[in-house]
């Protein structure tokens, strides 16, 4: 057998070994065969859209191009927009219910998306929660902010507080778009801007860069999140974050050790803080009660991890 033929046989055996080894690899360690593709195509904007229960024309060049910018920015900010779509399945039902009860247009739920991306974040300026209340403003709308609890992170209470603020703006401007812009600019600031320019609506007012984009960002997220596949987001319902089943326990006495109390309920301090992000510490003192604390609805929901 010549050397060349010998090498050929060795190479063939090595190739066969690699193929067999690959076939024996457990599925859990194989790379996914799913192919992720991104398209550079952006759908044509509609001629009009329903926004805050009103038909809004998008034929105006300035309005159209400012909205188009925010569509592009958010369409290609895939990680953030994908998270918003996933989180919306968990939080939108609560937001929609409260907005309806408070008589505020449902589209204001998208304000939460641009403010916090549906998470309890703290801004560099100190604003917190889904609705990004400042610590000095929160108590004016009934939210407690102490070293122990921060109700800006309480989804239900902060949403009702936001509704009070939005409705206050609406009473001043008699227009939901202006009320929305005032959420960012402040009602006094928006009034001064309009009066100095002799106009009465946000779309006719020259604003600071942040507020100038604010309403259009909400409009863009509404279009994208209502029609995700049209903008290249293919997120199956089973991959979205479903609401966490919980029940409330009324607390009328101080709890010195919340971790111990949590274990007595069959859960943990970590889960208590997950379900109640407004609780900041390991206790509930007299200043925090009475209050309702959420716990998992049953042992199959967020139970204690065990190996």
Q: Which residues fall in each region the model found?
A:
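An acidic, Gly/Ser/Thr/Pro-rich helix-cap/linker signature
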Residues: 5-103
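Solvent-exposed, acidic/flexible segments
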Residues: 77, 81-92, 101-104, 123-131, ...
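Short, functionally critical alpha-helical segments immediately adjacent to catalytic or ligand/cofactor-binding
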Residues: 104-119, 179-185, 272-275
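Substrate-binding/active-site groove segments that recognize
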Residues: 126-147, 159-161, 166, 190-193
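Catalytic and binding regions of secreted/periplasmic enzymes and modules that target cell-wall glycans
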Residues: 166-193
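Catalytic cores of secreted or luminal carbohydrate-active enzymes
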Residues: 209-232
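Primarily a LysM-type cell-wall glycan-binding module
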Residues: 237-266
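Extracellular LysM carbohydrate-binding repeats and other cell-envelope/extracellular binding modules
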Residues: 271-307
